[in-house]
């Protein structure tokens, strides 16, 4: 049986590790709420932009619109935007996106297309740059804000927009993690370009808040209020022509779509990290319990052995 001191040192080490993982869980839980607040704050602009586009759509056919962002040309080159995080300790969050990107890349190559990658996040960059002989990398972005901002989305949008307008690529797809709940985050593929604006339909958000129960911090789930604004009047008059409006609004729409993908990915990363740290804390608690049992058994065996030696010596 292991030495008593070794077991005692392991117990101390496991308990210290549990303190760290528990602290990381609470930090991630608080940041999840911040990420959700960011999504909700950007929602009014997204909703109003969608309504304006819907209003314009009702007055004209997009097929007849003179906007390069809507033109569906023959597809030869497809750019994949892979959104991962800069850090680990978040379960399978980064690995799932990388696997989905590899699968999609192989699918497109097998169908005769010429795919390339735009990588967002250090984890994706590190993985695919180490395999640069297998994957064509167009651009990389790292060290974005933990809660993505419109500036982050704008820098990425300008890159992919320039490539699309110059016909260096014919289609742009973003691979990100859709935030479903704290325990469910799904890798998702969405086409960014060419645009097909049919409104922004969002399912009802879930709000998560820290609270206490039985002297323990827990997380409660609630539904976000849906503050629907009335639709724009159908008789509203625009000074500019529909084509001018589209050319001005569609880049904003594209940036908003990408920002939403970045925000959902950030929330998913934090939720995955919170879940991973919660599991690590539970495992550490169970391991400390088992080690304590082993320590007590070893101590009891040592005491029994000493008693036997004393009794044996007295008998002699």
Swiss-Prot record:
It is a peripheral membrane protein. Keywords: ATP synthesis, CF(1), Hydrogen ion transport, Ion transport, Membrane, Thylakoid, Transport. It is found in: Cellular thylakoid membrane. Belongs to the ATPase gamma chain family. One of its GO terms (cellular component) is proton-transporting ATP synthase complex. GO terms for molecular function: ATP binding; proton-transporting ATP synthase activity, rotational mechanism. Pfam families: ATP-synt. Gene3D superfamilies: 3.40.1380.10, ATP synthase, gamma subunit, helix hairpin domain (1.10.287.80). Produces ATP from ADP in the presence of a proton gradient across the membrane. The gamma chain is believed to be important in regulating ATPase activity and the flow of protons through the CF(0) complex. This is ATP synthase gamma chain. The gene is atpG. F-type ATPases have 2 components, CF(1) - the catalytic core - and CF(0) - the membrane proton channel. CF(1) has five subunits: alpha(3), beta(3), gamma(1), delta(1), epsilon(1). CF(0) has three main subunits: a, b and c. Its main location: membrane. Coiled coil: none annotated.
């Amino acid at each position: 049986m292991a030495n008593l001191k070794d077991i005692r040192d392991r117990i101390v080490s496991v308990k210290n590790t549990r303190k760290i993982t528990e602290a990381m869980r609470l930090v991630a839980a608080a940041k999840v709420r911040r990420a959700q607040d960011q999504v909700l704050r950007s929602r009014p602009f997204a909703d109003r932009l969608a309504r304006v586009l819907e209003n314009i759509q009702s007055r004209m056919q997009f097929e007849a619109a003179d906007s390069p962002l809507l033109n569906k040309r023959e597809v030869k080159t497809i750019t994949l935007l892979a959104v991962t995080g800069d850090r680990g300790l978040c379960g399978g969050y980064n690995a799932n996106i990388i696997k989905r990107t590899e699968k999609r890349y192989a699918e497109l190559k097998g169908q005769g297309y010429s795919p390339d990658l735009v990588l967002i996040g250090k984890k994706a960059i590190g993985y695919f740059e180490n395999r640069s002989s297998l994957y064509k990398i167009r651009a990389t972005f790292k060290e974005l804000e933990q809660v993505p901002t419109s500036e982050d989305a704008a820098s990425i949008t300008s890159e992919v927009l320039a490539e699309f307008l110059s016909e260096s690529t014919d289609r742009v797809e973003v691979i990100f993690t859709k935030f479903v709940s704290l325990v469910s985050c799904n890798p998702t593929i969405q086409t960014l370009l060419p645009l097909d604006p049919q409104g922004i339909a969002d399912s009802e958000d879930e709000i998560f808040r820290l609270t206490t129960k039985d002297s323990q911090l827990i997380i409660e789930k609630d539904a976000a209020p849906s503050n629907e604004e009335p639709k724009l009047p159908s008789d509203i008059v625009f000074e500019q022509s529909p084509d001018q409006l589209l050319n001005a609004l569609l880049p904003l729409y594209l940036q908003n779509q990408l920002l939403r993908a970045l925000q959902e990915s950030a929330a998913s990363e934090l939720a995955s990290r919170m879940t991973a740290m919660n599991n690590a804390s539970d495992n550490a608690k169970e391991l400390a319990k088992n080690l304590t049992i082993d320590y007590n058994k070893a101590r009891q065996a040592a005491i029994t052995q000493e008693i036997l030696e004393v009794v044996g010596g007295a008998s002699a």
